[in-house]
């Protein structure tokens, strides 16, 4: 079977419909990750990332289900309380960006998620919010760098792994000046274009 963005979106919608029937406290669901890209497949593989928001309690933090060897379904469970300070998501590079996209809603009780989306999207690209998102990432990279150069006892492989993670965070911060943070799967494909 040849997967298209539309077919992957249908899988996500069907999963949420099934969860509506089996999880009565499901409050909202939306897409994140590679399905927000025009080309979600990378090398013929992808994952369908869905955030399920529960009214009171999330049954687990995360579930991963294989649809085929090439496609997996990642379900992240959150509660409504996680969204109480939703305006702060304007300054959060990981939570904020997905909420600014159109066509991500899979399920929404009483237009709750639409309201959250509108609140996050308003002034999301204002300079102070962009800089706050970038500073979060660059400060972490900088602190990690100073920790790394002071630690002379690390084995070479661990030092190198930490060094590459720091470079990754720095590149993600630079890319954040003009757009969404780079993801692990597409990092090498998109880092050059994003940082130019």
Regions found by a protein language model. Give the residues of each.
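Metal-dependent nucleotidyltransferase catalytic core
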Residues: 1-27, 32-101
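Conserved nucleotidyltransferase catalytic core and NTase-mimicking acidic/glycine-rich helix/loop elements
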Residues: 129-196
């Amino acid at each position: 079977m040849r997967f298209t963005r539309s077919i992957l979106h249908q899988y996500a919608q069907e999963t949420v419909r099934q969860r509506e029937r089996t999880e009565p406290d499901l409050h909202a669901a939306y897409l994140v990750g590679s399905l927000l890209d025009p080309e979600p497949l990378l090398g013929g593989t992808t994952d369908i990332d869905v955030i399920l928001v529960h009214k009171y309690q999330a049954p687990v933090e995360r579930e991963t289900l294989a649809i085929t060897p090439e496609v997996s379904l990642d379900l992240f469970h959150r509660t409504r309380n996680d969204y109480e300070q939703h305006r702060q998501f304007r300054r959060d590079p990981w939570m904020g960006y997905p909420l600014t996209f159109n066509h991500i809603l899979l399920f929404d009780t009483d237009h709750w998620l639409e309201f959250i989306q509108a609140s996050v999207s308003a002034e999301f690209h204002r300079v102070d919010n962009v800089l706050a998102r970038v500073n979060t990432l660059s400060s972490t990279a900088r602190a990690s760098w100073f920790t790394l150069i002071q630690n002379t006892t690390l084995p070479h492989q661990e030092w190198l792994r930490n060094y590459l993670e720091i470079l990754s965070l720095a590149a993600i911060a630079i890319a954040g000046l003009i757009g969404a943070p780079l993801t692990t799967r597409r990092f090498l494909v998109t880092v050059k274009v994003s940082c130019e």
